[in-house]
Amino acid sequence: MSSKAKKIFLVMSIIVPFLLYCVYYYGMMVKNAPYKFSEFKSIQFEYGYGDSLLNKYDSRTGDYQFVNTRDSVIKMKLKLTKDDFLYLHRKAADLGFWDFPAKELAPTRKTRSPRYVIQFNYQRKSKSVIFDEAYDGHEKLVDANQRLIKELQKVLEEAEARQKNSK
């Protein structure tokens, strides 16, 4: 058997089956992913101090309620675009939101700190996280939560500005 024939045999018997297996394995993983954007339904985001979560957004209904700088509760309808939802879905995936614990609360309620409830709803599943700003868990987890919260708030502010400019 020549050297060229040996190389071809090696490629055909080891490398090609390995590549086929990789395509099959990762194809099944992507196909069966629990949180796919194609199955996305809505986002619910609430935050405030203690149990009074006065700032709320529900993308299913478009209801947006927040406390402004004068401590007045403002209610309005706010619709996000598909691009906004895709951005938030990808940002949540990048930050590992699907692996966050469901409750990330402070050990004691002595300090007055903001509490956030973030919920992503899909056809087959939902993921909800309750995050307390005074949570003393792993530093990377706290940072990921804070970054996701900032992204959600930024998208809501941009959508509010878009809506005001279009009127």
Language-model-detected regions and their locations in the chain:
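Extracytoplasmic/periplasmic/luminal assembly and interaction segments
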Residues: 49-99
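Short, well-ordered, aromatic-rich surface patches in folded extracellular/luminal domains
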Residues: 2-14, 20-47, 104-167
